[in-house]
């Protein structure tokens, strides 16, 4: 493609609204433009990269036996009401009414639609297994869309759905998709890691996320340092090993004693005032889970994992108690809640609290705490369980080795759904014995547009983006320094045509711009390779070749150029862990 005929509206300065590097560079490189909050236009360069990601994903889905379909983005509300997600999904589901007053939504995901499609066609075990996928625009009405393509309201996604006759078949489908994802992300050239994850609003009993590793990632991943173990999970899912040793739940403890703590609301203030360490205090945190009051107890120096609490209770929606609810349930202002005399029946405690007794806690009374709390003697705990966020001081829950944290960007998620949707929507089939059974499902998502942003987050420098050759807008840019020297320009065009004949997706910068502008734009956009054609080099029988990833420049001879170029290109692909 001749860039003199291309649309590349690059920017010299970072847009004021852009916070993360991928957002800045996608805007500056002329790849996207904002339409409104969280919604972007894909310009030619940006769409080219998105399409390359989609092509790789499509190839791996097809190779794994999935079949491509295309489903409507606008979905009838009655399907979502069948599964109960019309109310549960919350405000991220953009709801609309047609002229007849019927409810619809813009699809954030397609479990309901695909289940409706399959239940109308599949009647026998002979038609299973079945795996259908699409690559399509999704819409989620994020409360705070930010970071460009990283967390927009509208995005491009690949979503696949498997249907099997039993759990064994569903496991095979899940593993097939898991391996297909690994192949796709490897082919793209990303440094990624699959991790255990919570299933969230999608539901199901087991899932993995695929994260692109980047220091700027939103998500924190707990990883076992022992590579043989391989344990990795996001913080929502990461388990904390159960305490070892004897339980102190019913150990001897002095009688409860109230102590005045005037104006001391936080753990830090209370412990400093009483002259004790934070690990001697029990925090009482109050929530509603699907509207039901729930209390959770953790050690004063720990952070509660509300996802673990929600899953333990068995609910969908968890919310921190309001100030009014705290006063109603404790009889005290915020900051003085405790488990003794609490007007909440369901109290859960982190299992770490079994290892000690004689705790300090709120007294459910203003400006007052209690000392000598025994959880076994003084209050009724429904269940002790893993409720806190893992730390780097905790051992690996699988092997006991050390844990370390790393940052990641979620670009894929695979779920075992079981019969969650097939039962609620009556998607059944007749088995070998003629009995009606619910289909066993799985769903598998990849953020196609998000991968483009993630690649930049992982690979960039002060000059711009550094794309893997597989998904760069163009793999190589031929830069002519000829200016008005038509002989140089003609030679540059010869190289461009030769590269195109070799199957290289090349751009030819034939714009009437200064060399500095061309070099700056090439670095900004992130073409993996640059081929510079100048009069001086041609006289010396060479052209200059630049590796964008390393910045290394070499000279390729005019005589024997093709073989020298192929060898150089192969080295660059190999540096990305790829085969040219």
From Swiss-Prot:
Main localization category: cytoplasm
Subcellular localization(s) per the UniProt record: Cytoplasm
Keywords: Aminoacyl-tRNA synthetase, ATP-binding, Cytoplasm, Ligase, Nucleotide-binding, Protein biosynthesis
Protein EC: 6.1.1.15
An individual GO BP term: prolyl-tRNA aminoacylation
Pfam family, one: HGTP_anticodon
GO cellular component terms, semicolon-separated: cytosol
InterPro entries: aa-tRNA-synt_IIb, aa-tRNA-synth_II, aa-tRNA-synth_II/BPL/LPL, Anticodon-bd, Anticodon-bd_dom_sf, Pro-tRNA-ligase_IIa, Pro-tRNA-synth_IIa_bac-type, Pro-tRNA-Synthase_IIa_type1
Role noted for this protein: Catalyzes the attachment of proline to tRNA(Pro) in a two-step reaction: proline is first activated by ATP to form Pro-AMP and then transferred to the acceptor end of tRNA(Pro). As ProRS can inadvertently accommodate and process non-cognate amino acids such as alanine and cysteine, to avoid such errors it has two additional distinct editing activities against alanine. One activity is designated as 'pretransfer' editing and involves the tRNA(Pro)-independent hydrolysis of activated Ala-AMP.
Stated family: Belongs to the class-II aminoacyl-tRNA synthetase family. ProS type 1 subfamily.
Free-text note on domains in this protein's UniProt record: Consists of three domains: the N-terminal catalytic domain, the editing domain and the C-terminal anticodon-binding domain.
PANTHER family, sorted: MITOCHONDRIAL RIBOSOME PROTEIN L39/PROLYL-TRNA LIGASE FAMILY MEMBER, PROLINE--TRNA LIGASE
NCBIfam families: PRK09194.1, proS_fam_II
The protein, known as: Proline--tRNA ligase
Gene for this chain: proS
């Amino acid at each position: 493609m001749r860039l003199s005929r291309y649309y590349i509206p690059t920017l010299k300065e970072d847009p004021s609204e852009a916070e993360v590097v991928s957002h800045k560079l996608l805007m500056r490189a002329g790849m996207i433009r904002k339409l409104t909050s969280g919604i972007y236009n894909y310009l030619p360069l940006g769409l080219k990269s998105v399409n390359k990601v989609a092509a790789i994903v499509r190839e791996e889905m097809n190779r794994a036996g999935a079949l491509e379909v295309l489903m409507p983005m606008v979905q009838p509300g009655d399907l979502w009401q069948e599964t109960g997600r019309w109310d549960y999904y919350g405000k991220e589901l953009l709801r609309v009414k047609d002229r007849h007053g019927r409810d619809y939504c813009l699809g954030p995901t397609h479990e309901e639609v695909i289940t409706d499609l399959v239940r109308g066609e599949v009647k026998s075990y002979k038609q299973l297994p079945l795996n259908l996928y699409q690559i399509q625009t999704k819409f989620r009405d994020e409360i705070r869309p930010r970071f460009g393509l990283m967390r927009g309201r509208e995005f491009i996604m690949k979503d696949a759905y498997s249907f099997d006759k039993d759990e064994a078949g569903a496991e095979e489908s899940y593993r097939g998709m898991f391996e297909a994802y690994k192949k796709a992300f490897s082919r793209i050239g990303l440094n990624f890691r699959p991790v255990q994850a919570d299933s969230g609003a999608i539901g199901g009993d087991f899932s993995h996320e695929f994260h692109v590793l980047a220091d700027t990632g939103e998500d924190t991943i707990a990883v076992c340092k022992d590579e043989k173990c391989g344990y990795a999970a996001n913080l929502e899912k990461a388990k904390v090993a159960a305490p070892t040793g004897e339980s102190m739940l019913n150990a001897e403890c002095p009688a409860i004693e109230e102590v005045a703590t005037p104006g001391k609301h936080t753990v830090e203030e209370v412990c400093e005032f009483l002259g004790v360490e934070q690990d001697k205090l029990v925090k009482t945190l109050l929530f509603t889970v699907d509207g039901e009051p729930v209390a959770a107890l953790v050690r004063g120096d720990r952070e509660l994992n509300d996802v673990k609490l929600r899953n333990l209770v068995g609910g969908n929606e968890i919310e921190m108690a309001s100030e009014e609810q705290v006063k109603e349930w404790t009889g005290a202002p915020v900051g003085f809640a405790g488990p003794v005399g609490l007007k909440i029946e369901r109290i859960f405690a982190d299992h770490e609290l079994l290892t000690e007794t004689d705790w300090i806690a709120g007294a459910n009374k203003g400006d007052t705490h209690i000392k000598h709390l025994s959880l076994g003697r003084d209050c009724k705990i429904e269940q002790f369980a893993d409720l806190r966020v893992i730390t780097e001081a905790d051992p690996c829950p699988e092997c006991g080795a050390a844990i370390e944290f790393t940052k990641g960007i979620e670009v894929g998620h695979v779920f075992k759904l079981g019969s969650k949707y097939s039962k609620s929507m009556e998607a059944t089939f007749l088995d070998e014995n003629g009995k009606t059974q619910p289909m066993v499902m799985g769903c598998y998502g990849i953020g196609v547009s998000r991968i483009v942003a993630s690649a930049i987050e992982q690979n960039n420098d002060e000059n711009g983006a550094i794309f893997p050759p597989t998904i760069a807008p163009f793999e190589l840019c031929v830069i002519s320094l000829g200016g008005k020297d038509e002989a140089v320009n003609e030679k540059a065009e010869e190289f461009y045509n030769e590269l195109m004949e070799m199957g290289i997706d090349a751009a030819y910068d034939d714009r009437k711009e200064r060399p500095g502008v061309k070099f700056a734009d090439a670095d900004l956009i992130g073409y993996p390779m640059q081929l510079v054609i100048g009069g001086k080099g041609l006289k010396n029988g060479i052209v200059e070749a630049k590796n964008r990833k390393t910045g290394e420049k070499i000279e390729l001879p005019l005589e024997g150029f093709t073989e020298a170029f192929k060898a150089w290109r192969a080295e660059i692909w190999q540096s990305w862990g790829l085969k040219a």
